[in-house]
Regions:
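N-terminal loops that bind phosphate or other acidic moieties
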Residues: 2-134, 138-380
Length: 380
């Protein structure tokens, strides 16, 4: 075996994709010292997106002060590439779930305002091309916070300006974009997301994702009604129907909420990364692709990061083996095309222990070593 590509997503809440790949690389080097190993950390639009792209493109990292989901000041960073022309922004850095303790999470009250501030900062620096990775958000405001930070105003039936939070979507009566940052007319946005959910409904932003952001059952209904109402207001103002657009429900409606007001397109996060970094060229002469994420299940094949890796492997006729902290629906994953799907846990453990970073890295290293030892026996 001469060439192995390591294309791991993060094991969310435990270890990032870079550290996972390093652990796998160590095991391969010990078993196959002459093998070429290419680390290709990936992400699907959520956490790790900026890191993966910026590292591969040798981006300049810049920092700025913005507001978190509860409008508290924080410092964030993002990447600039292409001689200052493109900004790579991770939504989660300004309004991600990890920024809020689980006891304080409430998508009725959170906002994407800080993401808009990041965009405004990049516009001031001269950027006109944007990749925004959306996902792992603590918000359900359909992007009105981001748009407000860029100059938009959202008014109620009495012409009062609304605070851009999830609970106020139902109250939006008018949208005023007359003061939108003029540099946006010269800009293009690629919105990279990791899901295909519609804007509202039983499979939409509120019902599927708001509970993990802290919403109770009544709040889920309120948020969904707000998204329905806001979609209708958008249609009246822009003649664009985002109601059933695949991916519109990503990141609390951020996926669909930006398209009517920006020169933007919504793309699968993993496709953005694989295309930008020319993944197919990397794997074309490989003997094996090793990939993985924290949980492998039926959703793995629904536009998520590993699905993109698998499709690239199939196109280049390279086998793909996936490792997971937890594995469900093994047979279904095999039918999707994975050569093998393996759990990394050596024995039953608590969730807390399974998520411990050092334990995860040890398990990745041990499992990869066993995979390589098996392959060695059949490739002598």
């Amino acid at each position: 075996m001469k060439k192995i590509v390591l294309a791991f997503d993060s094991f969310k809440g435990s270890v990032g994709s870079f550290e996972i790949a390093k652990a796998a690389e160590k095991a391969i080097q010990e078993e196959l010292p002459d093998c070429q190993i290419i680390r290709f950390p990936i992400a699907d639009g959520g956490e790790g997106t900026t890191e993966a792209l910026c590292s591969a493109l040798h981006a300049q990292t810049v920092s700025c002060r913005v507001h978190d989901p509860f409008m508290k000041p924080i410092e964030v960073s993002y990447g600039i590439v292409n001689n200052g022309a493109m900004a790579i922004i991770e939504m989660a850095s300004a309004c991600g779930l990890p920024l809020i303790d689980s006891s304080r999470r409430n998508p009725m009250k959170t906002t994407t305002y800080g993401v808009g501030e990041m965009v405004a900062d990049a516009l001031k620096r001269g950027c006109r091309e944007f990749i925004i990775g959306i996902g792992v958000s603590a918000t359900n405001d359909a992007g009105i916070g981001m748009l407000k930070a860029l100059g938009a105003r959202f008014l109620d039936s009495g012409n009062g300006e609304l605070e851009p939070v999830g609970e106020n979507l139902i109250k939006v009566h008018q949208i005023d974009i007359s003061q939108l940052n003029p540099a946006l007319k010269e800009s293009h946005f690629t919105i990279a997301c990791d899901v295909s959910n519609p804007f509202f409904g039983k499979e939409g932003a509120a019902y599927v994702y708001a509970p993990q952001k802290g919403a109770n059952s009544l709040q889920v209904i309120e948020l969904d009604n707000g998204l329905r109402h806001y979609a209708q207001v958008i249609k009246e103002y822009t003649n664009m129907d985002i109601s059933q657009l695949p991916g519109a429900g990503a990141a609390g409606g951020m996926g669909g909420g930006l398209l009517p007001f920006l020169n933007a397109e919504l793309q699968s996060g993993i496709e953005v990364i694989l295309k930008t970094l020319r993944f197919e060229e990397v794997v074309r002469q490989a003997d094996l692709i090793l990939t993985g994420e924290g949980k492998l299940d039926r959703q793995t094949g629904m536009g998520k990061a590993l699905d993109g890796i698998l499709r690239a492997g199939e196109k280049c006729q390279v086998p793909v083996i996936a490792l997971g902290g937890a594995v469900e629906a093994t047979e279904a994953l095999n039918r999707m095309g994975f050569t093998a799907v393996l759990p990394i846990q050596p024995f039953p453990v608590t969730l807390e222990e399974a998520m411990r970073p050092e334990f995860t890295k040890e398990n990745i290293e041990r499992t990869v070593r066993q995979v390589v030892r098996i392959i060695k026996q059949f490739t002598k």
